[in-house]
């Protein structure tokens, strides 16, 4: 049986394996995974599934970590920046920037006055009315919005021919791609702006220095991680002392006694104390049939690279490179142990180690190739007690003892039912382990477990180990650049202490007024959507009432949790963690214990809807139907997507359009599978379901006529274009068009309640036009042809196709820009929307 390949990233190295994607927004896998070995294209993720891949590469410079050895014994309070032979103080640079901004503002105003004086006769009646009753907005926020909008536009394009090009035509020029960057989008830029802010926060001296301060613990952990000098002094000694020795030694180091080896003990220590998945993995997740409860899932694991690489005829060189990597790590550990052993004997032991570990992974790959995931694994009839699982697999692993070691005997017993995500795989794996000849079993399993741990922790050791990992990636994937110490350590801080980091970000970079105005916008949009349900043409009365009930009951999480403003609350979260600035490896093990305690709490307390699924600095947004919540982290509530000082037509067009899109997902065919309490179950009537299908078909036809490309493709003489599969995108197309229409209606209601605002000093544009420009400019992008072609092949539509198609179906847009019937931006056939 053939399986697709997918990636799961271990703490220190990317490990490719097959896995079922968990779309329920749950906790994830059993090990705290790290993308440190993910090579050049890994970048860094702020949980950004909706707004594109980061695609950014940062090559680490070791020198940055040795700045403490700067020979200067003094430094000015206001530092200098040198550019070739000139030097400038930061104050001088700031003054220069302010002067330039002021000059630009003056020039914009002069241009507006000059332009308006020449074109009164061409200005629309709406603009004339606005000019007659008020002046232009010349506040700093309006100048900022006007400057940003005009700079990204290509005004030579007719907006009724290609509105995205009109709104974003100059964006690629202003945002050129570096050689190691495959794309830049609005959200990509926000993401890296946030990263820069977080870097500054992490590297700053802690303002609260008490032993219980979460800020101090976070920064001490981060500084211990970037201490390359300390890691070079320690080498692999920490791994040998704190992992190999507690497991009973290692055959390569000549201190292993097969008679004392206990698989049960080794698996428990590996999976729980060292938080590394070996023969299998597990996770605490939400029960799909009762979302108030948490359950334990048991899943496949145990391979250091894609299962396909182990067995395909075309991947022999990859297998050779992998074995070379294993051998190198073993040699480094042997050298750091101070072992005094005959070199021939040592070489034989290392070869045995490589053969043992590789053979078990090879057998796991064969099992993977010949099994399939369990269908509907959460079905109550497919769940199994821990006692039955142990007995039915010949007691190879005592699962009762294993999970009691993890969660405690008071929380788990033999009658605890677990979910096998890969039932056939788990049983075959345990049968394989049980069939290993007794003469070799202890040594072979020990060698395998030591390799799994070494592979996981190699990125946490000195540069010699990291370089071995890097060589493997260069051999296999031709990526010589590595993301370096800073990104690796940031990843750890982000995943290990996200609330401490999120609190610092929210307090430093987010104002309460930002949150208040965003909540005002979402209230207007939600009400506009509720009002629109009444006039909906494809829902019957029963479905309309259910839709309105769900929207009324829905809540939102905007910006950040309230506890982020209370230091004591954040300190309390991390009170059990001990962090030593000079002992990075022990810090990792202490964080493993913290994760163990956190998972136990989650299993025993069940669902907690007060939790935030995103960090405050994430750049994403979604409607989480299982909790009936709109999630908008503070990382999204920033310019150019949103800023509280901007006019409402700007914020409603940009942020409001996104909010409208995701609120529609609360009541479309997808949201129609979850009721107002988040319980799974269809609430659309049969008649409404059939009518909804007709609406989707209209959007399918609208997108079927679109083309992605053309793109220059390596190996192809002519540029390649890809047709849009409208059927696959129809439900998103409906949300896209409905979202911007709902945002527009909400904006009009806000005007009715609060009055018109002054327009920005942008020539010729009414507030309505600025609204649609703001929407379009959240979708500006530039991307390599290679990545664009890949996206096109998997039917990930580019922003220009999405934007133009969505707006062409809106009468409100075509009226705002007076697009004639039959023009590209005025679709002849309009579709029903929410």
Predicted regions and their residues:
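Intrinsically disordered, low-complexity cytosolic terminal tails
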Residues: 1-74
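Helix-loop boundary elements of multi-pass alpha-helical membrane proteins
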Residues: 64-104, 321
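Alpha-helical transmembrane segments in eukaryotic/viral proteins
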Residues: 93-134
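Intrinsically disordered, low-complexity linker/terminal regions across diverse proteins
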Residues: 116, 347, 357, 363, ...
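Short, Gly/Pro- and small/polar-rich lid/capping loops
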Residues: 128-151
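Active-site-surrounding "flap" and adjacent substrate/cofactor-binding loops of secreted or lumenal enzymes
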Residues: 137, 141-142, 158-161, 166-237
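Hydrophobic/aromatic-rich, well-ordered segments within soluble, folded domains that form packed cores
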Residues: 152-174, 309-332, 730, 740-742
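Noncatalytic, helix-rich "gating/capping" subdomain that lines the substrate-entry/channel surface
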Residues: 197-524, 561-564, 578-584, 588-594
């Amino acid at each position: 049986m053939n399986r697709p390949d997918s990636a799961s990233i271990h703490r220190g190295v990317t490990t490719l394996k097959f896995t079922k994607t968990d779309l329920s927004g749950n906790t994830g896998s059993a090990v705290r995974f790290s993308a440190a070995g993910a090579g050049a294209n890994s970048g860094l993720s702020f949980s950004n599934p909706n707004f594109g891949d980061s695609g950014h590469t940062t090559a680490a410079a070791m020198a940055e970590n040795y700045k403490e050895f700067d020979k200067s014994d003094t430094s000015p309070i206001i530092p200098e920046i040198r550019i070739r032979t000139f030097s400038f103080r930061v104050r001088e640079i700031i003054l220069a920037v302010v002067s330039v901004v002021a000059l630009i503002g003056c020039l914009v105003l002069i241009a507006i006055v000059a332009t308006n004086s020449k074109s009164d006769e061409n200005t629309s009646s709406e603009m004339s009315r606005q000019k007659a009753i008020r002046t232009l907005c010349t506040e700093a926020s309006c100048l900022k919005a006007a400057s940003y909008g005009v700079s990204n536009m290509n005004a030579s394009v007719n907006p009724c021919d290609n509105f995205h090009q009109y709104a974003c035509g100059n964006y690629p020029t202003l945002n050129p791609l570096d050689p190691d960057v495959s794309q830049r989008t609005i959200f990509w830029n926000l993401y890296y702006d946030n990263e820069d802010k977080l870097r500054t926060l992490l590297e700053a001296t802690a303002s609260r220095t008490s032993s219980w301060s979460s800020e101090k613990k976070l920064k001490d952990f981060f500084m211990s991680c970037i201490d390359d000098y300390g890691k070079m002094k320690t080498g692999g000694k920490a791994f040998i002392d704190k992992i190999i020795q507690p497991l009973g030694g290692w055959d390569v180091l000549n201190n292993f006694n097969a008679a004392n080896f206990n698989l049960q003990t080794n698996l428990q220590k590996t999976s729980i104390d060292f938080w590394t998945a070996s023969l299998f993995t597990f996770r605490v997740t939400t029960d799909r049939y009762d979302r108030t409860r948490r359950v334990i899932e048991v899943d496949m694991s145990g391979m250091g690279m894609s299962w396909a690489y182990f067995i395909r005829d075309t991947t022999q060189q990859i297998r050779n490179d992998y074995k070379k990597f294993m051998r190198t790590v073993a040699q480094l550990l042997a050298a750091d142990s101070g072992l005094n052993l005959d070199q021939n004997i040592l070489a034989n032991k290392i070869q045995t180690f490589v053969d043992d570990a590789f053979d078990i992974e090879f057998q796991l790959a064969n099992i993977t190739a010949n099994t399939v995931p369990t269908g509907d694994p959460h079905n109550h009839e497919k769940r199994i007690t821990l006692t039955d699982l142990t007995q039915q697999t010949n007691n190879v692993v005592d699962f009762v003892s294993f999970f009691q070691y993890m969660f405690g005997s008071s929380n788990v017993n033999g009658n605890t039912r677990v979910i096998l995500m890969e039932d056939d795989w788990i049983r075959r794996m345990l049968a394989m382990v049980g069939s290993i000849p007794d003469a070799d079993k202890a040594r072979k399993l020990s060698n395998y477990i030591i390799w799994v741990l070494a592979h996981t922790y190699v990125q946490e050791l000195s540069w010699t180990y990291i370089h071995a990992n890097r060589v493997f990636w260069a051999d296999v994937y031709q990526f010589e650049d590595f993301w370096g110490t800073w990104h690796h350590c940031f990843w750890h801080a982000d995943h290990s202490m996200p609330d401490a980091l999120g609190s610092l970000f929210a307090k430093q970079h987010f104002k309460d007024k930002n949150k208040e105005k965003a909540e005002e916008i979402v209230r207007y949009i939600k009400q506009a959507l509720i009002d629109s349900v009444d006039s909906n043409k494809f829902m019957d009365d029963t479905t309309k009432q259910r839709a309105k009930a769900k929207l009324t009951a829905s809540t939102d999480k905007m910006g950040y949790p309230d506890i982020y403003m209370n230091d004591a609350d954040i300190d309390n979260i991390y009170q059990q963690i001990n962090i030593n600035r000079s002992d990075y490896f022990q810090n990792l093990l202490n964080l493993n214990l913290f994760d163990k305690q956190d998972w136990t709490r989650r299993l025993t307390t069940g669902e907690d809807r007060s939790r935030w699924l995103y960090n405050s600095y994430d750049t994403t947004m979604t409607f989480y139907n299982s909790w009936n919540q709109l999630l908008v982290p503070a990382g999204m509530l920033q310019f150019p997507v949103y800023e509280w000082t901007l006019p409402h037509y700007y914020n409603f067009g940009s942020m409001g359009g996104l909010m409208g899109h995701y609120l529609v997902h609360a009541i479309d065919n997808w949201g129609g599978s979850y009721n107002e309490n988040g319980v799974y179950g269809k609430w659309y009537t049969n008649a409404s379901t059939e009518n909804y299908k007709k609406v989707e078909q209209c959007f399918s036809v609208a997108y079927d006529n679109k083309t992605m490309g053309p793109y220059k493709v390596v190996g192809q003489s002519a540029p390649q274009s890809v047709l849009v599969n409208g059927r696959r995108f129809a439900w998103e197309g409906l949300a896209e068009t409905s979202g911007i229409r709902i945002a527009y209606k909400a904006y009009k209601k806000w005007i009715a309640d609060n009055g018109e605002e002054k327009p920005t000093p942008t020539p010729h544009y009414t507030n309505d036009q600025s609204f649609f420009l703001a929407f379009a400019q959240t979708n500006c992008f530039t991307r390599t042809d290679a990545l664009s072609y890949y996206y096109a092949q998997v039917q990930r539509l580019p922003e220009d196709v999405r934007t133009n198609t969505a707006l062409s179906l809106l009468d409100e847009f075509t009226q705002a820009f007076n697009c004639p019937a039959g023009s590209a931006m005025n679709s002849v056939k309009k579709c029903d929307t929410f």
